[in-house]
Amino acid sequence: MPDRSYILRESTVAFSKNVIEFCKQEKLTAVNRPIIDQLLRSATSIGANYAEADNAGSRTDFRNKIFIAKKEAAETKYWLNLMLDLTANPVACQRLLTDFHHILMTLQKVVNTLANRSQSAAKHTANR
């Protein structure tokens, strides 16, 4: 069974590609152009930051990149929700939101694990 790291890496790459394809299909207007630009930036940044985290040289660097990836995910959700009302293809946009939700849940699990480890380490240090 593939580990969570591999699954998240592959999921973020696939998600980025799907967002790119979705945006390429959209007819650009004065209204949706800035939203599409922001969506492309934030959606592809999730995977880029996760890739950096996965290759981090320290736990602190890993933690920082994971938190950045999660922030980019929150921004991506915002832009996808706006696009849902603007797109001529709401089914494709909803599919992206569904895929996104799985990525967000996995990132949240990583963040929770980091928080739990940090709390355990703090308790261990305090008990010395």
Give the role of each language-model region.
Residues 1-128:
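Short, C-terminally biased terminal segments at protein or domain edges
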